[in-house]
């Protein structure tokens, strides 16, 4: 299982990257034959994306309830997001079926538990990747989002 974590020096603690990295290193040490860990810091964006896209899982935004832009881009490319994927995220979107995000609580123990589980059950990866792509198409397609904004703006203009 190929796991990717991008480090933003000045925002590591803010994003929870410090905890996620420590947990990832622990699971890599525990299961070296089952997991590859890509830690990327301070590289040009094109290189960052290339390295990210060669992975199975991106670890991002430990303290968030929802995936951020980095995770959404990764999911659109078929990566699995491990990070914020609380039920409130799905409720806001009225999503009843798809659960592509491996949700973790903001603790070292939770990250270790979820990461070890997926490392020991790689057979789950293809369906999570497929669900992630479907989730992006369904809820984050740029045309659909633009049409929702257009409808909102038109509704607001009609009220004035």
Go through the PLM ranges and name each one.
Residues 35-43:
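Active-site donor-binding acidic/aromatic loop of nucleotide-activated sugar
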Residues 80-87:
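Short hydrophobic beta-strand element within catalytic cores of glycosyltransferases
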């Amino acid at each position: 299982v190929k796991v990717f974590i991008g480090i933003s020096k000045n925002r590591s603690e803010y994003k929870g990257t410090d905890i996620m990295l420590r947990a990832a290193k622990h699971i890599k040490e525990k299961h070296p034959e089952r997991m590859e860990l890509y830690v990327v810091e301070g590289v040009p964006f094109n290189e960052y994306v290339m390295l990210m896209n060669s992975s199975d899982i991106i670890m991002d935004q430990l303290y968030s309830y929802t995936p951020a832009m980095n995770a959404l881009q990764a999911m659109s490319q078929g990566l699995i997001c491990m990070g914020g994927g609380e039920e409130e995220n799905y409720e806001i979107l009225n999503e009843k079926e798809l659960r592509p995000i491996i949700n973790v609580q903001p603790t070292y123990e939770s990250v270790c538990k979820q990461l070890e589980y997926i490392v020991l059950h790689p057979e789950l990866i293809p369906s999570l990747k497929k669900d992630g792509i479907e989730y992006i198409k369904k809820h984050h397609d740029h045309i659909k989002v633009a049409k929702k904004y257009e409808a909102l703006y038109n509704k607001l203009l009609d009220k004035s």
